[in-house]
Amino acid sequence: MTESLLSTTNISLVYDDGARVTHALRDVTIEIPNKRFVGIMGPSGSGKSSLLYILSGLKRPTGGDVRLGDYGYKAHSDLDLIDLRRQRFGFVFQQPYLLVWQTAMENVLMGAPILDAAARKKAVGYFEQLGIGAMAEKLPSQLSGGEKQRVCVARAMMNDPDIIFADEPTASLDHANGHLVVDLLSAYRKHGTVVVVTHDPEMLQGADSVLLMRDGQSLGWRDPVDVLGAAGPSKTVAL
């Protein structure tokens, strides 16, 4: 088995507002190997997005720890985790965020370690693969929500991160453009790991494995073919 790149041990996440205690995650222990395309699926409130945010260091768990190789999150400060995210992670959030005063290309090149002709050529390649080649010099105000999301996908890849974390990356896209994004993320496993949260099993048919979540607990890894088959025409999985 490939050595684990990212792992969790007994992760829990509890919200207590004084009136109610909510267990968002309960004792989640998983391993994600290097250079894999994996999905996290579950119904609303299952904890899948919370787990993604903890894996990426954007949220601290109530208990347990996350490790990236030998790097334990618990032993490091919030500033350390900011540096970790900048140096080793790429992000695609459900709601696209772009700097409104910069063109789509300028937003993508922000993710490049060196701004040179090679970086621009690389960015142009991503734009073409994502079907937004004609949008490179447009401002975000001139783009649709789906076009903005595809720009964010290109930006996430520009610095060749070890891991790309994507939270519902196809939610604002039609079927065809959703597949463009998924195909590009799937191909990225040649360079690094991709972790995708989605409600649509069809978007994970090319994944290496899918983690099913319910009520804040891990139900274990599944073969994407089995998950897609269980979903049927409704595109929902009974958990």
Regions found by a protein language model. Give the residues of each.
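Catalytic Walker B motif of ABC-type/P-loop ATPase nucleotide-binding domains
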Residues: 164-167
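Helix-to-loop junction immediately C-terminal to a conserved catalytic motif
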Residues: 56
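ABC ATPase NBD coupling module
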Residues: 19-22, 73-90, 188
